[in-house]
Amino acid sequence: MKKIKVLCVDDSALVRGLMTEIINSHPDMEVVATAPDPLVARELIKKHNPDVLTLDVEMPRMDGLDFLEKLMRLRPMPVVMVSSLTERGGEITLRALELGAIDFVTKPKLGIRDGLIEYSEVIADKIRAASRARLRAPAPAGHAAPLRLRSPFASSEKLVIVGASTGGTEAIREVLQPLPADSPAILITQHMPAGFTRSFAQRLDALCAVTVREASDGERVLPGHVYLAPGGETHMRLGRSGANYVIGLQASEPVNRHRPSVDVLFHSAAEAAGGNAIGVILTGMGKDGAAGLLAMKRAGARTMAQDEASCVVFGMPREAIALGAADEVVPLADISERILTRLGDRGHRV
C-alpha cells in the first residue's frame, strides 16, 4: 500500500513531534519531513514531493498565509492548516481556506499533547481527505452580482436548508453571494469548531446581499436572513412556534461524529417545513446529511447535491446520491440559480 507522504511545517518542536507521532501511528500515511518555518519547508517540498502539507498559521520568517499564497500560485498542493482556537485564529484560517487550503485542525488552548492525541483520528481523516481532494483556484475578490428571483418572493413559509463539511466554507460563499436580499430564509450547518462560525458569518455578511449571522437559540427565522449553526457545542434544529419558524440549539451528543450535525438539521427541517423546503448538500467527507436529505425528500422537499466535479471532497453528496436522496445533482456554479428556479416553481413542492 502506497502511503500518503506528509510534510509538517510548524515553529513548535512539540507540535512537530506530536503531529509526526500521530500521523506515523496510521499505517496508510507517514511524515517524510518536518520544517520549523516556510523557508525550510520550501526546500523540503522540492526534495520529498509530499502528498499533503500541514501548515501552522503563524510562524517566524514568513507567516503561513504568505507562504500558502505563494505555494498555491507556484506549486499548488493539498494543505491542511493548523490553527489556534482563537477569534484571530479563526479569521486567519478562513482566509487560508479562501486562498486554497483544503481544511484545518485546531490546536487546543491548553494541554496540546493530550488535545492533539485525542483528535488523532480527526487529523488522520483530514489528511486522507486532503490527499484525495480536488485543488481549486483561490476565491476571487469582490461581490457577485445578485441574481433575481424568477417570481416575487412573498411567503415566509419557504426555506433553504444547507449542509457542508470539507471545502464547504468556499462552496457556501459561492452559493450565497449571487442570492438577492429578498431570498427566503436559509439555515446552514457547516462542520466547524466553536469560535470559528462567528468569524465565518461576519465574513459572509460583508460579501452577500442577504444578512448572514450566527444562529441564536429561540430566534425567529426571517426571510432575507442566513442562519449559521454555531460551531462545536450544539446542534441546530428548525422548529415551529405558531405560524413562525424558530431555531433551536441543543447541547446533545455528536451525531455522525459531528456537532453541529447536518443530519440533525435536515431531519428537523423535514418535520417542520416538509414540502416548503429546499435541501442542499455540499462538498464534505463522510456521510453526515445523507439520511437527513432523504428524510427531507420523503417529506416533500426539493433536494439537490453538489456534483463530483465541483466538490473538494465528494463524500457527503456521494452518500446522499447513493441513497436516492437527491432530486438533482448540480455543479456548484449553478446551485444558486437552481435554488431560485425551484423557488419560482408552482405546485405544492417548492
Curated annotation (Swiss-Prot):
GO molecular function, one term: protein-glutamate methylesterase activity
4-aspartylphosphate, modified sites: D56
Entry's family note: Belongs to the CheB family.
EC number assigned by the record: 3.1.1.61, 3.5.1.44
Gene name as annotated: cheB
SMART domains with a match to the protein in the record: REC (SM00448)
Natural source organism: Bordetella bronchiseptica (strain ATCC BAA-588 / NCTC 13252 / RB50) (Alcaligenes bronchisepticus)
Domain of life: Bacteria
Protein name listed in UniProt: Protein-glutamate methylesterase/protein-glutamine glutaminase
UniProt keyword Magnesium present: no
Subcellular location: Cytoplasm
GO cellular component, one term: cytoplasm
GO biological process: chemotaxis
Pfam families reported in the protein's UniProt record: CheB_methylest (PF01339), Response_reg (PF00072)
Annotated PANTHER family: PROTEIN-GLUTAMATE METHYLESTERASE/PROTEIN-GLUTAMINE GLUTAMINASE (PTHR42872), PROTEIN-GLUTAMATE METHYLESTERASE_PROTEIN-GLUTAMINE GLUTAMINASE (PTHR42872:SF6)
Residue ranges occupied by any CheB-type methylesterase domain in the UniProt entry: 152-346
Keywords carried by this UniProt record: Chemotaxis, Cytoplasm, Hydrolase, Phosphoprotein
InterPro entries: CheB-like, CheB_C, CheY-like_superfamily, Sig_transdc_resp-reg_Me-estase, Sig_transdc_resp-reg_receiver
Record: active site: S165, H191, D288
